[in-house]
């Protein structure tokens, strides 16, 4: 009697395409990028950070968790080599468009941005934005009304 929960979870994951592992590229090795790379939030949902990239020469070659920060010049090769399908932007607003352009050039079709900058991409590239300030304002609005 009841539902086979394991089977149900498996079916839902299949529909949402969260079964298996999806490789992502993280652009930005500053405070936010380090926090993302050190967190299990993506891994818990089937995403593996397969590469971390930063244009700051002082950060290239440093380690975040088990990942070595790479120069963005290696992005295209890494995306193709590791079958990366998602790019995560953890960069300042001024760096968001150039970083998105590099991801698009590499063949990434999904970009998740923590930047407040509006990003222009071709129609076949999906951009999702997550702004902590906007989320806080949204929560505050509904709490106060």
Place the predicted regions along the sequence by residue.
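Hydrophobic, well-ordered beta-alpha structural blocks that scaffold small-molecule cofactor pockets
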Residues: 1-106, 122-144
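Short secondary-structure boundary segments
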Residues: 91, 114-116
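Internal alpha/beta core interface subdomains
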Residues: 105-114
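Short, glycine/polar-rich helix-capping loops at beta-to-alpha or helix-loop-helix junctions
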Residues: 119
